[in-house]
Amino acid sequence: LHIVTRESAGIRVIQDLKGKRVSTGAPGSGTEVEALLVLEAAGLSPKDFAKQERLGAQESASALSEGNIDAFFWSGGLPTGSIVELAATLARKGDRIQLVPLPPQSTPVQVFQRRFPGVSAPGVIPKEVYGTRNDTPTLSFWNFFICPASLPEEAAYALTKATFENLEALRQAVPAARNTTLENAVRFVGGAIPYHEG
């Protein structure tokens, strides 16, 4: 999860979003769902903002660059092109991109993981990805194949088998899939989301 801002905005921790103009993601998106849940875990809500926007990553990056918002949430793989472009644009303007940390021991992370076991794990956005001053601790969210329990076992098995037999092709097409491994796939068995028998 990215919480993106610029150094000149003075946002160092999630509580600093109070009184700021913040985009929580496009309406109904995974980003919006995750942002609202993390804010709730931090004891915040969009009512605490000076203004809430509901923009996608590209629109949020443009709004931040133009000074129309102070921060935005984005849930996506590393790197995200619009954030790379934002970092370059801010540098040309004499500012610098900053990511708000969500350390593993912080209240928002601890509360979120207790409420939703098996949905996320502590992660790090390395400073090299966007040219930030430091590595940024965050919550990593996993991609899931979601299907109804009524999906035939053979079909679920065939999807799973095809995915894991073609990981190299998947990783070439989607760089963020580098973390798609059998070990990660079974990491959350018994968590909040039940696994299909297939």
Residue ranges with predicted function:
Residues 9, 46-151:
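Pocket-lining segment of extracytoplasmic ligand-binding domains
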Residues 2-66, 168, 182, 188-198:
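Bilobed "Venus flytrap"/periplasmic-binding protein-like clamshell domains
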Residues 14, 19-21, 36, 65, ...:
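Aromatic-enriched hydrophobic runs in primary sequence
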Residues 76-94, 99-101, 111-114, 142, ...:
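An extracytoplasmic/periplasmic, membrane-proximal ligand-sensing/linker region
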Residues 28-37, 115-181:
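Ligand-binding clefts/hinges and TM-proximal coupling segments of bilobed small-molecule sensing domains
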Residues 4, 13, 22, 33, ...:
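Extended aliphatic helical segments
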